[in-house]
Amino acid sequence: MILFVGFLLMEIVMPQISRTALVPYSAEQMYQLVNDVQSYPQFLPGCTGSRILESTPGQMTAAVDVSKAGISKTFTTRNQLTSNQSILMNLVDGPFKKLIGGWKFTPLSQEACRIEFHLDFEFTNKLIELAFGRVFKELAANMVQAFTVRAK
């Protein structure tokens, strides 16, 4: 019974990544950088390709290719866009059972803001998690830093 309860708890708790940074750039500048999906391969470590599949003023569907240590995967998200404030991501396709999260940009002044990045995810199976989990966690954990460096 304890193993069963433990198993249920493992199923409920998804891996999470949360990062926050205070940066000397406006919320608008940081929002524009994060929303510029097509530029990701130029500065995001491990990102080998990106493309916008569909775009409207309040929503974007985009695919991102990531690769590290010989492991390559593509995932697609539908992003709800609130201009200069937030980008909320939901999984459309990829090696995940679940992937939800987003970015929040809070102005501190005209020339500074707080960036918050949060991601909850679960891979489709243990084999994919073993092969790709560490790579994805490392890439996702470094995203705030990569965008902050890009802003300079």
Question: What does each of the following model-derived ranges do?
Answer:
Residues 30-34, 40, 62, 115-117, ...:
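Hydrophobic pocket/interface hotspot
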Residues 6-9, 77, 119, 149:
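Generic detector of N-terminal low-structure segments
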Residues 91-142:
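Beta-strand/loop substructures that line and gate deep hydrophobic ligand-binding cavities in soluble
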Residues 4-57:
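Hydrophobic ligand-binding cavity/cleft-lining segments
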Residues 38, 136, 140, 144, ...:
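Short amphipathic alpha-helical signal-transduction/dimerization elements
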Residues 17-18, 72-76, 98-101:
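Short, surface-exposed coil-to-beta transition loops
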Residues 22-26, 65-69, 80-82, 92, ...:
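Solvent-exposed residues in well-ordered beta-strands and their adjoining turns
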Residues 51-95, 146, 150:
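Glycine-rich portal/gate segments that line the openings of hydrophobic small-molecule binding cavities
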